[in-house]
A protein has these predicted regions:
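Basic- and aromatic-lined ligand-binding clefts that recognize polyanionic substrates
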Residues: 4-32
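Histidine-acidic metal/acid-base catalytic patches
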Residues: 21-35, 39, 45-159
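Electropositive, glycine- and tryptophan-enriched low-complexity nucleic-acid-binding patches
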Residues: 1
């Protein structure tokens, strides 16, 4: 991979082999630093991953960040009814960042104060039958612009 300028990274997911906080931490502990992490805020939150702990301990391994939010009421239904991942997505588990229950301060702090140079991918896994995709994309873009402009301003103030 090095020869081609590529880096291997693991993308954790709900209802997959590495899901919960202790599983993600064990995976990262048992693999070398040559294996990066695609940190997904929605999957992390829904699986009980502590974003502050993961970014503090393994921030140097984060190569890519996916930003999406979680609807608390749907997460509760998913857990109560033991819904599959596909059923959870169809039920509207994920939403545009800033419209759910995730506290993004550990991620915005990590991005502002670390040397992270990777991509931020804003996701809005919406059912297009329930919401016009362009409306979700517009809200997601505004959220990212507002959130990370504030994060950048905080970094400049601290220096």
């Amino acid at each position: 991979l090095d020869r081609f300028g590529l880096k291997l990274a693991y993308h954790h997911h709900l209802m997959m082999l590495v899901e919960q906080h202790h599983e993600l931490e064990e995976f990262l502990t048992k693999t070398s630093d040559s294996v990066g992490l695609v940190l997904d805020s929605g999957h992390a939150f829904a699986a009980g991953v502590d974003l502050a702990q993961i970014t503090e301990k393994f921030g140097h391994r984060i190569v890519h960040i996916h930003l999406k939010d979680v609807r608390a009421d749907v997460l509760h239904r998913v857990r109560e009814n033991n819904l599959s991942f596909n059923d959870a997505v169809r039920a509207g588990l994920f939403t545009v960042p800033g419209e759910g229950c995730i506290d993004y301060s550990p991620l915005t702090g990590f991005i502002a104060y670390s040397d992270y140079q990777g991509w931020l991918i804003v996701e809005a896994e919406q059912d297009p039958q329930k919401e016009e995709p362009s409306a979700a994309v517009s809200r997601a873009f505004r959220w990212a612009k507002d959130t990370f402009s504030q994060s950048h301003s905080a970094e400049e103030t601290a220096q």
